[in-house]
Structure formats: C-alpha cells, structure tokens
Amino acid sequence: MTDIKNIRNFSIIAHIDHGKSTLADRFIQVCGGLSERELKEQVLDSMELERERGITIKAQSVTLHYTARDGETYQLNFIDTPGHVDFSYEVSRSLSACEGALLVVDAAQGVEAQSVANCYTAIEQDLEVLAVLNKIDLPQAEPEMVINEIEEIIGLDAHDACRVSAKTGVGIDDLLEQLVERIPAPEGKRESDLQALIIDSWFDNYMGVISLVRVKEGRLKKGDKILVKSTGQTHVVDSLGIFTPKRTETKLLEAGEVGWVSGSIKDIHGAPVGDTLTLAKTPNVAALPGFKNVKPQVYAGMFPVSADDYEDFRDALAKLTLNDASLFYEPETSDALGFGFRVGFLGMLHMEIIQERLEREYDLDLITTAPTVVYELALVSGDILHVDNPSKLPEGSKIEEFREPIARVNILVPQEFVGNVITLCVERRGAQINMQYLGKQVALTYDIPMAEVVLDFFDRIKSVSRGFASMDYAFERFEATKLVRVDVLINGDKVDALAMICHLDQSAYRGRALCEKMKELVPRQMFDVAIQAAIGSKIIARQTVKALRKNVTAKCYGGDVSRKKKLLQKQKEGKKRMKQVGNVEIPQEAFLAVLKVDD
C-alpha cells in the first residue's frame, strides 16, 4: 500500500473547452493507466451524451501511479469536474475530496467566468491551486498576457505557471512533478476509526448502489460492516477498489485514498451523496461536513406521452436522482397531459441533459412543459407562499405582492463586445452593480431576474459576443415586482399546461406572440378554433384557426339564390353543433411553443 505522504488528491478546474478532459487523457497515458488499444479520446467522459456534446457532466475519478524524478512512486487520485455553469455543484463536490486543484486556462482564450467561480470555490475550501496554461501549441496562444490575466482577475500567483499542451503532450512531465511537489499530502491516521465521505453514487443493475468515496480516517476492507450516518442503516462491504479508469477491485482502501465501494445496497437512497460512512462498531464517529444541498432554480412538468409509461418513468427518475443529487421531483397531474412529475433542475442545460438521459437510457417518450422559476408570494392573509407552477397560483385578489428571484450574474467579456452585452442585460430588466476593466477583458456584474437568466440568457450572451463572453450566476434574493399569469384558452377552455408567468409590461406582447405561434401549430379542424390569451378574465389577444369547409353549393348550377342560402345555412348549423362537442388535440410542439416566444 502507498504511504499516506505519497498520496496526492487533486481535481482539474477549467472553463468549458479549455481542455481538462484531454489533459486527463494525457495523465492516464503517461502513468500507464490504460493500454494503447483502450485509449480513446476523453476517456473519462463515459456517458454517450458527454461524448456527443463534448462536455463533462458527471464527476469521475481515476487512480494513477506516477514515479517521480526523486525515485518515489506517488499515488495520484484525480477527480474530473464539469466546467459548465449548471454543474457547479458537481465541482464543489469533487473539490471537497481533494487537497489541491489545477486551474487550467486556455492560453489562447484567457480567463473565463466559470474558471473564476470554481477557483474561488477551491480557495474557500483551502485547496492549493496550481495555475496551468494549456494549448500552448496553438499559434494564437499568448501565455504572458494570460498569466497577467490570472493574476489580475483571480489574484493567483501565476508567474511560474506550468505551460503544457495536452494535445501534443508537451510539458506534462513537468506538470506532474510540480503537482507532486506543491500539492500537500492528505492528513489522516490509518489507525483511527473509519470516516469516509461519499462524493458520488450511481446505480448498477447487478451490484446495487456503488459509491465513490474519499477515506478521511481509518481503513475500509472487504467484509467490513459499514454504517451510513444519515440513514443509520448498516451494510456489508461486498467489494471495493479503485478506478484505473476501469473499475478494479483491491483489498482495502486507507486514509487519504479515493475509491469505490459496493455494499449491495438495493435501496436507491441508501447512500446519499455528501454522507459519511463509518464502521458499524464505531457509530459515534462525527459526520463530515457534507456539501450544501443545491436548490433547483428551474422547474418544469414532465409527462410520459403514453400513460402506461408512468411507472417506468418514476423508477428512471429515482435512479437518476441517486446519480445526480441536485435533481428534485414530485408527482403532478395536469388536465391536458395526465399524470407526470414536477421536476426541479439547476438550469436549462441541466434540464436538456436530464431529458435526453431519460429518453436514451430509459427509453421514455416525454412531454416537457415550459420551465418556470420559483416565485415568492405574500398573500393578503399574511402567509408567504412559494410557487413553481403557474397553474398553482392563487387568484389575483388574494395576492398582496409578487416577488421574483433575482440572480447576481458575473460576466467576463472582451472590450469590443461590451456594448452588445450591456444592451442584452438591459433588455432582460437587469440592473448594473459593477463594471471594471481588467486587461483586455471587462468584468460586468448585474442583478437580473432569474426567469430571464435561466431560459436562454447563456445562449444569447454567446451569440451577441461571438462566443467570447462567459458568465456565471447565483441566486441573490427575492424582490417585489409586477407579475401576472397569462392563461391560454382554446375554444374557451383553459389549458393548464400552457399558462406562463411574466412581467406586466411584457404580458400583452408575449400573449400576442404566443397566440400567433399557437395558430401555426394547432391543426385545422372542421370548426373554427379560437385561441385566446387572458390575464384573469381580461382577454389580451386572440387568433382564430379557420375551419375546413366543404363547398356545398358546388352542385347548384344557376338556380335560385334561396337554394344556396338553405345549403349554407344547413352547413353552418352542422358546424355549430360540432363545435359544441368537438375537442381539439393539441400537438406536442404547441407545448414547446411557450418556450420559443422570443423577445
């Protein structure tokens, strides 16, 4: 077994596309974790979706052995982290298991907002942060400028930052040497009682729940009886080991090491992420401080297309929740869509990914309603209510004031695009808090309503700045504002799944836009279909989908006009009867139309 002073636990922090997964590949190659044949690009992005979108979603871990120049062999436990803003909680989780972090910055692009946010998370957790410049093989790389940026924006001392190219493998050895030298060894006594932190869990159909753990104190071996602190349940360890990136069994895990444990836990919530494991015979070991539970920012209704899939859908959600601690769900029924769940997400990317994972990994067809954020209502009775579903809003007369969540948004953008970004923030009802020039970049801080941020702000900001701006956001507070619920009526019936909450100033416009969009999507019937948008009992917009009609007077050649009138009158009455009993099928696209009502 490796001596504790020769263990190094670290993770890599970087913005999307700054090359952390490729750097991980190089580490694995240099330390001989996989044979040449098994090495595919981005080994750690094991989920199909991750490979397809080229982003890291789940944290992964790898244990490598590296023989340094001083002849010692070090055990490197490397935990990969995602870079996208929606997954920042995954990052804080990975970091809590490490003593150090590599801050990887693209030498051509410079510092970006997510790296700043994640870097502060690392510094708050007292980790040793090493700056690394990646992609120095690119002709447009400007290492000197980027080093200044790191020092100015983040305040890290970066004059001796390692310069590497993960793609070509330049400088990787020096980086590993620096890593071994500067990142501290874990603290912990192997003789004391077991104390281990669960970093991540996932469900395997054969082995039950498998947990990724970081052993802080003591040791864990096969056959041990372990106790999960929060649930109080005990399990016997069936197998444990490390990832090399393949799952490899070992005899024991000791203080300072990171590895996986399986205890044939069949209950999906048997090993919650952030929990502490200890031996059953030492139940009063203190629980480790877990990570803060993340509150979902966006809620949407998800409904299976066919009602028979409801049970499968429920099981699939339960399995995903195990793997993704930030997912929240509760059952919901809708008149238009039947039984389903109200699911909470961290942001729109997270929502898309969960929906794709449900559709791919569990073979489900789902309809998703328009996402909403959580609003706070002060009622006339003095109660405070939190609402995440437009159809659950009480009547207007009962509401004293409406409060919407405000997000503090930090944006880093090159100087030439500042104007566009500011315009966008103002359109989104943002209030400027701060603005400072740092080298070639400008740091903007805005308070923007969460509802405006989560939907497509990220995409919009990328498009107005040609992809150079980067942002990160966090919930700040609730603020009173004028909001209304816009209902959609089809032939006078409310469709609950299409309701949306928006600002009073935008309501007439959004109602009109939605009706126009719906008119294109609702198929023509045998009778006129009226599509209306209403606030309370006041109709603010209307579109009519015209009826299909047969030309009943075609068979009359000449003849008396009263004959034609009679036929037309008869047709009219038929249509009227149809309209009373007919109901309109609303296609799936129409529910998504609510999302696409552009500003």
UniProtKB/Swiss-Prot annotation:
Main location: membrane
GO cellular component annotations of the record: plasma membrane
GO biological process: positive regulation of translation
Domain of life: Bacteria
Binding annotation for GTP: D17, H18, G19, K20, S21, T22, N134, K135, I136, D137
Known EC number: 3.6.5.n1
Gene Ontology terms, MF aspect: GTP binding; GTPase activity; guanosine tetraphosphate binding; ribosome binding; translation elongation factor activity
Keywords: Cell inner membrane, Cell membrane, GTP-binding, Hydrolase, Membrane, Nucleotide-binding, Protein biosynthesis
Residue runs in coiled coils: none
The keyword Protein transport is assigned to this record: no
Membrane topology: Peripheral membrane protein
InterPro entries in alphabetical order: EF-4 (IPR006297), EFG_III/V (IPR035647), EFG_V-like (IPR000640), EFTu-like_2 (IPR004161), G_TR_CS (IPR031157), LepA_C_sf (IPR038363), LepA_CTD (IPR013842), LepA_IV (IPR035654)
SUPFAM superfamilies hit by this protein: EF-G C-terminal domain-like, P-loop containing nucleoside triphosphate hydrolases
Localization terms from the record: Cell inner membrane
Catalytic activity: GTP + H2O = GDP + phosphate + H(+)
Any one Pfam family match given in the protein's UniProt record, by short name: LepA_C
Tagged with keyword Protein biosynthesis: yes
Residue stretches making up the tr-type G domain: 5-187
Database matches in PANTHER family: TRANSLATION FACTOR GUF1 HOMOLOG, CHLOROPLASTIC, TRANSLATION FACTOR GUF1-RELATED
Purpose of the protein: Required for accurate and efficient protein synthesis under certain stress conditions. May act as a fidelity factor of the translation reaction, by catalyzing a one-codon backward translocation of tRNAs on improperly translocated ribosomes. Back-translocation proceeds from a post-translocation (POST) complex to a pre-translocation (PRE) complex, thus giving elongation factor G a second chance to translocate the tRNAs correctly. Binds to ribosomes in a GTP-dependent manner.
Family as reported in the entry's similarity comment: Belongs to the TRAFAC class translation factor GTPase superfamily. Classic translation factor GTPase family. LepA subfamily.
Protein name, UniProt field: Elongation factor 4
Lineage, uppermost ranks: Bacteria, Pseudomonadati, Pseudomonadota, Gammaproteobacteria, Oceanospirillales
Gene it is expressed from: lepA
